[in-house]
Amino acid sequence: MIFENTDFRQEVLDLHSPYDVKLVQSFLKKYNFDFLSEDVDYTMILYNLNGNLIGTGSHKGKILKYVVVEQQYRESSAFAQIVTHLTDILLQHEKYVFVFTLPANIVIFEGIGFKHIASAPPLFSVLEFGYKSITDYVDYLLRIQRDTHTDNIAAMVVNCNPFTNGHLFLIEKAASESELLYLFVVEEEHSAFPFDIRWKLIENGIAHLKNVVMVKGGEYIVSGSIFPSYFLKNEEISLVSQKQAELDVNIFANYVVPTLQIKKRYIGTENLCKTTAAYNKAMHEILPKHNVEVIEIKRKAIGMCGDVPNFISASKVRQAIRENNIMSVIEFLPESTANFLLSNDSWEIRQKIKKSDSRH
């Protein structure tokens, strides 16, 4: 498909054409990008009127990627044309568009209407554009905020894939030490258990805790929209995890903390997942600067597994489901989760887990 304007000609790339893909790969390689067609849903390319390729841009989901314009055209309308084309397409079915770029490029995107959300210097910043924004999420937080006269207010973020007695232990611990606990549930649909199921299992499992307010994580709390691993492909994976964590924690510190007057954030000790360990490290480094105490709780274990404690883990539950041996981890499960997994209502999820080797 070809579009024309007075200065440039743009085309939609055929991601199934080896020739088209190689064309963009060669162009982006000059700028140290390794373009992979499977990393994007849509790509457009921009030519000058002499037929020379001078720019390109893509998107994956609601995230803009690989937006590059030749140096000599960066003062022209080429950059704005690419970004406007991509955002127009995305906003036909999305409420948000996100872009990750170097902090030095913030002003360029702000010049075409994007709003800066947070940075993890010196490597990248995240900006957004659309019908919805982080201001709408702050408004949501204000609507669910509970009136209180205490400053003993805590927060915790959970995924619960699925909800286990380990999660329940951490939540009960935080609730017992706080007057009010805001429990953020990751809303991203990249887990084996869909968000609505995870929410319901948690809600049923903590019904006895009257000082806990459940909160939807939205686009800004451990969301795929805020994890730009594609942007740092040439960096060490430890640095990727570190910068993603900093971005997430900075958003929490700058928007959630002042809105809900959070004074404490509870986390579980992480022994297995390096990415989660990086989040914990970032919280310890960043949140105290915002007058938020980070309280790390040792995870709950049931007996021993050889010479080490048998820590309760959602991944162990999913593995037991794969092996059709849910009873081997029944002690890991609160009543709400056990009843669900032993019912026909969970059949589709159990089949999905059995067919997948994903750690999520």
What function would you assign to each model-found segment?
Residues V40-Y42, E94, S178, I262:
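Short, well-ordered alpha-helix to beta-strand connector turns
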Residues I89-P103:
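Conserved GNAT acetyl-CoA-binding A-motif
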Residues E75-D88, H167-E172:
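Conserved acetyl-CoA-binding loop-helix of GNAT-fold acetyltransferases
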Residues T43-I45, G51-V68:
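Conserved beta-strand in the GNAT
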Residues V24, H59, D88-Q92:
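Beta-strand-enriched, solvent-exposed domains that form extended recognition/catalytic surfaces
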Residues M1-F35:
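Short amphipathic alpha-helix that is part of the acyltransferase structural core
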Residues V67-S76:
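A short, internal acetyl-CoA/4′-phosphopantetheine-binding micro-motif in the GNAT/acyltransferase core
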Residues T101-H360:
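Nucleotidyltransferase catalytic core that binds NTPs
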